[in-house]
């Protein structure tokens, strides 16, 4: 089958790789000059299945009000003037219950754990290198309330059989020796030894090269204008003056997926703006070993070979990609507070990206009401964590195979309701 994939981020490239492995003829189209040059370019660098959790959580609405008045708040909201933003935020609020949080986190962990298994198999088969580390991830708490609040996450981890370690403040240095100097600031931590880290952009670039060896064709610097429809199916992709045709089409354009498919299916994928800095390491003994997640500021600090990546925060501001110095200040504050002297933040590069977020945190992977149109989008802050599993799952669905994990609750159909013959997001 001839397949066109729109988008060459980590999710699009992973989709291409697994579809090509399944024997399909794949073409990837993207407006950028190469793979992973947008949202996948400088993310936090973590592969964290156990920490897969929706931003929509109990207590978040009240926290959001408090964060409005804090200098280093992890969440900021600015109205963009669209009805879609208001609808999206309302649906996110409806997912901030204990019951829905557990449901959403459970299926996110299911996909993320499967994806990590797929990545490990890929690494064993291809020996792909991307400055990866397998030292686990450590979530650190600054208050007793945060430590006590980890109980709801631990319950989900137990149910999913995910290994974990609950550490006291004195025990944190066993996982991250450099934290010994600041352990008095922390109340404890939750460590997931099975998590991994690495450079997502490097991984995606090298996976694209492996995909090319399987016959995948990449068309970069190509504008994607519209999907052409005929007879109730996709007839092609309008790229400037050219119509690119195939048997099936996969939209993996992250936050830009929503507008492209709007006339065909309404998907609640909204851009969640995040930031990162990447600093050179100046003292390895004072730098992290793997990834450390600061629960207070919702910031991840990740060790690469000779660099530290610090990423996080969330702004609900539409497609605004302006770099804000105050956000850089927050990232620098966090890494210098936990790992003083580890990296040279004065020489750090500063970046922002738009994560494609659904209101319930779970991505949209699979079929749509349009017979030959498939989606692989909405992974939020977990694009790399879920990329290999999402790509393999999609390849199975498109090849007529039964996926290894449950997939029905990952498709767009969980959002659709029939109203006057139209498919609309189910906001009720």
Curated annotation (Swiss-Prot):
GO annotation, biological process: D-alanine catabolic process
Pathway: Amino-acid degradation; D-alanine degradation; NH(3) and pyruvate from D-alanine: step 1/1
Source organism, top-level taxon: Bacteria
Gene Ontology molecular functions: D-amino-acid dehydrogenase activity
Enzyme class, UniProt record, top EC level: oxidoreductase
Keywords: FAD, Flavoprotein, Oxidoreductase
Cofactor: FAD
Keyword Flavoprotein: yes
GO CC terms in record: cytoplasm; plasma membrane
EC number: 1.4.99.-
Reactions that this protein is recorded to catalyse: a D-alpha-amino acid + A + H2O = a 2-oxocarboxylate + AH2 + NH4(+)
A Pfam family matched in the record: DAO
Matches recorded under SUPFAM superfamilies: FAD-linked reductases, C-terminal domain, FAD/NAD(P)-binding domain
Record carries keyword Transmembrane: no
Function of the molecule: Oxidative deamination of D-amino acids.
Protein family: Belongs to the DadA oxidoreductase family.
HAMAP family noted in UniProt: DadA
Protein name (record): D-amino acid dehydrogenase
Native organism: Burkholderia pseudomallei (strain 1106a)
Organismal lineage: Bacteria, Pseudomonadati, Pseudomonadota, Betaproteobacteria, Burkholderiales
